[in-house]
Amino acid sequence: MPNQHMEELNDQQIVRREKMAALAEQGIDPFGKRFERTATSGQLKEKYADKTKEELHEINETATIAGRLMTKRGKGKVGFAHIQDRDGQIQIYVRKDAVGEENYEIFKKADLGDFLGVEGEVMRTDMGELSIKATHITHLSKALRPLPEKFHGLSDIETIYRKRYLDLISNRESFDRFVTRSKIISEIRRYLDAQGFLEVETPVLHNEAGGAAAKPFITHHNAQNIDMVLRIALELHLKRLIVGGMERVYEIGRIFRNEGMDATHNPEFTMIEVYQAYADFHDIMDLTEGIIQHAAKAVKGDGPVNYQGTEIKINEPFKRIHMVDAIKEITGVDFWQDMTFEEAVALANEKHVPVEKHYTEVGQIINAFFEEFVEETLTQPTFVYGHPVAVSPLAKKNPEDPRFTDRFELFIMTKEYGNAYSELNDPIDQLSRFEAQAAAKELGDDEATGIDYDYVEALEYGMPPTGGLGIGIDRLCMLLTDTTTIRDVLLFPTMK
């Protein structure tokens, strides 16, 4: 079968391959070998930021850099170029009489996109730009394809997501955003590690989807001839570790949900879940606030965070309000009073709140009211707590009012950023809630989970009172990088 890739070479690609062959003929490996640099562009700019042209000439310091050739100009015996490394770009100044004829030819024949190593004197041009006056140039790797025309800022959205490497080369803003993402995750780890939490890894392949209400991806294990699912949450395995005595655990991992895609949803995404023995949801509220404020401070500094023109007071204590009070504040409807399911449905109809066919409890109506009227008002960081039992199958009932649970969700800019509760550690209650979920599944609720008997058995060995938390890392990264779509914080988002 002919190689279609080879048949489609355009003129530029042919010329680049010819140059590759010419390098090989000269005894130069077109794809280079190990190269030792002494500094990055950023380190040089930082080190010599306050040095004038004259001072640099007097110091006469040399440096060796390496990176991708991004611009090149000049003719005859003198040339200027920009080399790009992980910190950004730095100019190089190449003179034929300084590097020698053979070495100057390597520079002259280099194409944009090629990798070069440059050794030379640190200087400042008459225009004040910090540069390297080359004394030697090393060819490090040949680029066989030219960079996209607009390499100063790739603008084609499809290419940005499909060929992230081109986006990273051409869009510094995008590159920096992903560096920030990594920093956010590192800071969260540092914060939890300092408080005695242990980072663990749990299985991605599960026998039964659990720990969340979501449709799973189903796969098949050939050797055991069993269907398995990709995890939709981290929860149930982490709580088994609390049973095992680990007391403080967390996991940062990929989650898979076979659901729709939009600006804030991708089929695979990153979550952190944290579990702390002997804590309740009030302690976990404090922990959540600490995690988010610590991450924000690390990448944004002290003070509020600006998101799409709105000032988010992330540095101040987060508001805390019961779900029923929040609904009452906005709609005037009081769900504190006892009511039948029929009365709740009548209220929903009166207020034009959709009632799904699988609803059988007042709690589901309360949650629907919250989603319909309250969520869109929650701009500043707000902990909404006291979710109904009907929508919280893994959370502990509130001892004062068992219709509700000791659970909270964190909302910022109308979106949910975290979900947490005092964990249900009563195996009998847990089994009955699993059974209710299984019944809802039978009634057509696609997101209801099945029964995890192994988890119930684990609880029967005893689990201490525990607080647990889940935070969507991608949404947090969107907030802290002022980004409107999840695809801009995922290096390789899911594409058709």
Curated annotation (Swiss-Prot):
One GO cellular component, as annotated: cytosol
PROSITE patterns: AA_TRNA_LIGASE_II
Record protein name field: Lysine--tRNA ligase
Localization in the cell: Cytoplasm
Native source species: Streptococcus thermophilus (strain ATCC BAA-491 / LMD-9)
Catalytic activity: tRNA(Lys) + L-lysine + ATP = L-lysyl-tRNA(Lys) + AMP + diphosphate
Family (UniProt): Belongs to the class-II aminoacyl-tRNA synthetase family.
Names of required cofactors: Mg(2+)
Residues annotated as binding Mg(2+) 2: 416
Disulfide bonds: none
Pfam families: tRNA-synt_2 (PF00152), tRNA_anti-codon (PF01336)
Gene: lysS
Cofactor binding note from Swiss-Prot or TrEMBL: Binds 3 Mg(2+) ions per subunit.
